[in-house]
Amino acid sequence: MDLISHQPNKNPNSSTQLTPPSSSRYENQKRRDWNTFCQYLRNHRPPLSLPSCSGAHVLEFLRYLDQFGKTKVHHQNCAFFGLPNPPAPCPCPLRQAWGSLDALIGRLRAAYEENGGPPEANPFGSRAVRLFLREVRDFQAKARGVSYEKKRKRVNRQKPQTQPPLQLQQQQQQPQQGQSMMANYSGATV
């Protein structure tokens, strides 16, 4: 969709403002996340610079954000551990959901490189962060009784054809001599 008309304005009395298209929701969220992380680094004791930031600092940041979560994650000793829909309230803490953390790390990983960080030194892509996210995902799945297992791709097991598929397809499409094009149509009679 084009937000700016390319046709000249024929009315000399009207004034039109050309406004650049606004950033996407993703870009805005990425900018907010990046600013939050940079502020976290500034407020860290001792303050951290971006080049000295490691995967361990990213994990500290994720644990800090956990206190603002809105997803109930049951303790292992909670009576509702493993139940997807608990019947009553419990004192278990609210945490950041795994999906939110995963999306946050993806946005911060992109923002790090956009702000001049070298891809090979990206702390958001470190092994420690990937392992942490996997552990959070697995624990939350158990605590909530939800499975995050990957769905396996279906393998199409057909009998091997003696002719290459292209040649077979071409033969099926060409009508036999004296046969109409409608002969291959189911329900047609010749």
UniProtKB/Swiss-Prot annotation:
Arranged from A to Z, the UniProt key words for this protein are:
Developmental protein, DNA-binding, Nucleus, Transcription, Transcription regulation
- Is the keyword Nucleus assigned to this protein? yes
Q: Where is this motif: Nuclear localization signal?
A: 150-154
Spell out the GO cellular component terms annotated for this protein, sorted alphabetically and separated by semicolons. Answer: nucleus
Entry's localization field: Nucleus
Q: Which cysteines are joined by disulfide bonds?
A: none
Q: Name one GO biological process term.
A: response to light stimulus
Q: Which GO terms describe its molecular function?
A: DNA binding
- Domain ALOG residues, every copy: 25-152
Q: Give me the ranges of the annotated region Disordered.
A: 1-28, 145-190
Provide the tissue specificity. Answer: Expressed in hypocotyls, shoot apices and lateral root primordia and, weakly, in vascular tissues.
UniProt biased composition (Polar residues): 1-26, 180-190
Keyword flag Transcription regulation = yes
User: InterPro entries annotated for this entry?
Assistant: ALOG, ALOG_dom
- Tell me any Pfam family this protein matches: ALOG_dom
Q: Where is the composition biased (Low complexity)?
A: 158-179
> Which family, according to the similarity comment?
Belongs to the plant homeotic and developmental regulators ALOG protein family.
Q: What does this protein do?
A: Probable transcription regulator that acts as a developmental regulator by promoting cell growth in response to continuous red (cR), far-red (cFR) and blue (cB) light in a phytochrome-dependent manner, at least during seedling development.
This chain's protein is named Protein LIGHT-DEPENDENT SHORT HYPOCOTYLS 1
Q: Which organism is it from?
A: Arabidopsis thaliana
Task: Give the lineage.
Answer: Eukaryota, Viridiplantae, Streptophyta, Embryophyta, Tracheophyta
